[in-house]
Amino acid sequence: MAVSDHRLQSVILDDESLAAVSRDQEQERQIAIFDLLEENHFAPAGSERGPYGLKISLIDGRLALDITGPSYERRHLLSLSPFRGVLKDYRMICESYYDAIRNATPQKIEALDMGRRGLHNEGSALLQQRLAEKVELDVDTARRLFTLICALQWRG
């Protein structure tokens, strides 16, 4: 089994779960999917090999990860409660960051970007922790997946 077998080859965000977003947020969503598919490590527990497809949706206020692969099909549901604080803070700082890009000084933009990255790291580490028994992810994969989870939470 090659290490590259444990990877995502497709990612779908459930249309019914998606919130209306700004152009900046939509662009970030598309970049995250592109980057995720270009390079990732995604190894579901109990699966011998990939590659895998992933559909991300919200079901009754929980995050649903539908994973399919050769001889593998499973849905993992995660409570969003542990993510609420970091999602709220991340959304607020992103909104400030997008506003700052248009109007603020480079120093203000840099400060907001540092805060945004810090919260993004916190959210992706929490995602890795919550999925630890279900799916093994590398740091970059967790970061890109966290971006997509945020996309489901943003309310334009």
Regions found by a protein language model. Give the residues of each.
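Charge-rich, low-complexity N-terminal segments
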Residues: 1-51
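A signal for specific C-terminal beta-sheet/loop modules enriched in small/flexible residues
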Residues: 2, 6-7, 28-38, 75-95, ...
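Acidic-enriched, low-complexity/disordered segments with a strong bias for Aspartate over Glutamate
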Residues: 5, 14-15, 24, 35, ...
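Generic alpha-helical propensity signal that fires on short helical segments
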Residues: 26-31, 96, 145, 153-155
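Short, surface-exposed beta-edge/turn micro-motifs
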Residues: 51-52, 62
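Short, exposed beta-strand/loop patches in secreted or surface proteins that constitute
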Residues: 54-58
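Negatively charged, Asp/Glu-rich surface segments that serve as flexible interaction/assembly modules
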Residues: 59-127
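C-terminal charged interaction modules
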Residues: 104-156
